[in-house]
């Protein structure tokens, strides 16, 4: 079964275990993301979205696309400008396509839970203050 999802202003046709690059999605490698804006599932077309459907995916990596060069030149003015741009991209692996309000499988939920516990543990630890510097000879002579 396939679905059409909308993310980052673009539409993607996805199926289970597909590996796709989309516009930047918040999350680190291994995090589970959910796409609720499902435009089509199999032969069911949404108006504008299919109610109760959900696509879950795992973030594989965060990266950047290839460089796009923007070159501007004004003729006969001895004026030109070159500028490069690299778009932030996220590679995701589609885990499952859910319909009729079904919940994500336990595997997806288990991967999500440990990340939340680790984040709370790190936030609880206070940072240590930097050690004070010893007085130099010039300062102690004064």
UniProtKB/Swiss-Prot annotation:
Residues 74-84, 126-135 have a biased composition (Basic residues). One of its GO terms (molecular function) is rRNA binding. Keywords: Ribonucleoprotein, Ribosomal protein, RNA-binding, rRNA-binding. Pfam families: Ribosomal_L21p (PF00829). Residues 74-142 are annotated as: Disordered. Residues 107-125 have a biased composition (Basic and acidic residues). InterPro entries: bL21-like, bL21-like_sf, Ribosomal_bL21. One of its GO terms (biological process) is translation. One of its GO terms (cellular component) is cytoplasm. Belongs to the bacterial ribosomal protein bL21 family. This protein binds to 23S rRNA in the presence of protein L20. Part of the 50S ribosomal subunit. Contacts protein L20. This is Large ribosomal subunit protein bL21. The lineage of its organism: Bacteria, Pseudomonadati, Pseudomonadota, Alphaproteobacteria, Hyphomicrobiales.
